């Protein structure tokens, strides 16, 4: 099973590529950020785009990067702008930024 440390290290290693796609901040949230993951857990990643670079193509490229990094895991990507007003504050409180 993937570890929190592996996920954070993989994100850090790819930080420059993500930056070129307009990502200002990227972080891990959910069960992995709380060290409560199980075999059924997905990897929850929060991304924050530079407004002028937030577009479908860049989002799909970011999704492809994370799917390649974590091939055997389910990955959920959420943009900061796409956070629900109800659960968003909880996510922002627990996110571990890289």
Kindly give the residue locations of the regions a language model identified:
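Catalytic core of pol beta-like nucleotidyltransferases
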Residues: 1-25, 33-39, 52-98
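Conserved histidines in hydrophobic membrane contexts and catalytic metal-binding motifs
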Residues: 28
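Short hydrophobic/aromatic beta-strand micro-patches
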Residues: 46-48
